[in-house]
């Protein structure tokens, strides 16, 4: 289908005439679902921003005002809150699919995707703080203070982010502005991610990404993606029946700078990294391990000599990695006591061991199977 308009031609190339492998499975739908959820979050978040006041004395009460006084404000708040969890569910599925099918061989796609992941984690953390509840306030204190480990400039950076010597209303305004602006930067990188992906074509379940036996994306796959409707219906129903099951009870208590919660726990999608941070008693080493738990995957783009002899081994290692990540997430929400303090370092070691084992094996695969 030939279209003269350049913009429509670009969209047509993305959604209609895109050459797609005949062997794609439903796991290739995670990316399109992520795009829809991102737009959904931007729309609901913009509505909430109309009524939110980034002030330390009014932030918590304006959230309650949105819930009880604004027409359908509770719907937007609940959908935005649970939409973040839906986004991270598909984001982790998308990443694990990429590891499973070795998508890191598409270097630009992989690097841009990981950058999106890091920015989304920052975005979610700042949105978590905006509620200005007891748990989110102390999470902001703990996480931002980790930047003090940066040599020379660390304490200055922390003071700059806090806009003073502690987390205050100025910090809240800083986070609100960034939380509002960052999604637009994420959208730009997502566009670059799509351009990089569609310039080469994605990998397939046969571990190849050449122009072999391909079909147009529409109507073959556009029709198959209709199961997204079921996902959205489930999301709406579960959000209305269990609106705050993925949250913490401390999020219904207004922030009190004079009294910290008994047990500080971040949102579930940060728990694996939080468990790794707590597993190391040294602050500097803990922060380095926290960063490396994500940054390590940038090095997977160095893999360029893949051999098909290792597909079964790769599947096994990825499954083990998923299991270790899940256990770390469970340990992250447990209290700091035995046996959890013993298990956290153990599974942190397994997490990094599996990641670097995959990296080493696939980087040296051609040498191993000459």
UniProtKB/Swiss-Prot annotation:
Superkingdom of the source species: Eukaryota
A Pfam family that the UniProt record links to this protein: Cytochrom_B_C
Gene3D superfamilies: Cytochrome Bc1 Complex, Chain C
Membrane topology: Multi-pass membrane protein
Localization (cell): Mitochondrion inner membrane
Listed GO CC annotations: membrane; mitochondrial inner membrane; respiratory chain complex III
Major localisation: mitochondrion
TM helices/strands, residue ranges: 30-50, 74-96, 109-129, 175-195, 221-240, 284-304, 316-336, 342-362
PROSITE patterns on file: CYTB_CTER, CYTB_NTER
More info: Heme 1 (or BL or b562) is low-potential and absorbs at about 562 nm, and heme 2 (or BH or b566) is high-potential and absorbs at about 566 nm.
Protein name: Cytochrome b
Gene this protein is translated from: ctb-1
């Amino acid at each position: 289908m030939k279209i003269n308009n350049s913009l429509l031609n670009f969209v047509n190339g993305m959604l209609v005439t895109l050459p797609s492998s005949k062997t794609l499975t439903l796991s290739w739908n995670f990316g399109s679902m992520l795009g829809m959820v991102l737009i959904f979050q931007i729309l609901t978040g913009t509505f909430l921003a109309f009524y939110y006041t980034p002030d330390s004395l009014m932030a918590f009460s304006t959230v309650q005002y949105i819930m009880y006084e604004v027409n359908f404000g509770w719907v937007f708040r609940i959908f935005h809150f649970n939409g973040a969890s839906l986004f991270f569910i598909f984001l982790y599925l998308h990443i694990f699919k990429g590891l499973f099918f070795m998508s890191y061989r598409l270097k630009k796609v992989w690097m841009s995707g990981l950058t999106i992941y890091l920015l989304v984690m920052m975005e979610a953390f700042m949105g978590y703080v905006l509620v200005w509840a007891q748990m989110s306030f102390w999470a902001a204190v703990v996480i931002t203070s980790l930047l003090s480990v940066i040599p020379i400039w660390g304490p200055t950076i922390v003071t700059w982010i806090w806009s003073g010597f502690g987390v205050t209303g100025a910090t809240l305004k800083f986070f609100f502005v960034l939380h509002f602006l960052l999604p637009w930067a994420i959208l730009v990188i997502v566009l670059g991610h799509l351009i990089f992906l569609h310039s080469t074509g994605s990998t397939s379940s046969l571990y190849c990404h050449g122009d072999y036996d391909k079909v147009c994306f529409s109507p073959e796959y556009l029709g198959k993606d209709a199961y997204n409707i079921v996902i959205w219906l489930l999301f709406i129903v579960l959000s209305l029946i269990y609106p705050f099951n993925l949250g913490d009870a401390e999020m219904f208590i207004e922030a009190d700078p004079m009294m910290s919660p008994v047990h500080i726990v971040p949102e579930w999608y940060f728990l694996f990294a939080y468990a790794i941070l707590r597993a190391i008693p040294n602050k500097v080493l803990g922060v380095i391990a926290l960063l490396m738990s994500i940054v390590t995957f940038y090095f997977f783009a160095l893999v360029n000599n893949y051999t098909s002899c290792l597909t079964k081994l790769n599947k096994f290692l990825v499954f083990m990695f998923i299991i270790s990540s899940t256990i770390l997430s469970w340990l992250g929400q447990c209290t700091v006591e035995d046996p959890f303090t013993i298990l956290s370092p153990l599974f942190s070691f397994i997490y990094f061991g599996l990641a670097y084992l995959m990296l080493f094996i696939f980087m040296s695969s051609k040498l191993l199977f000459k």
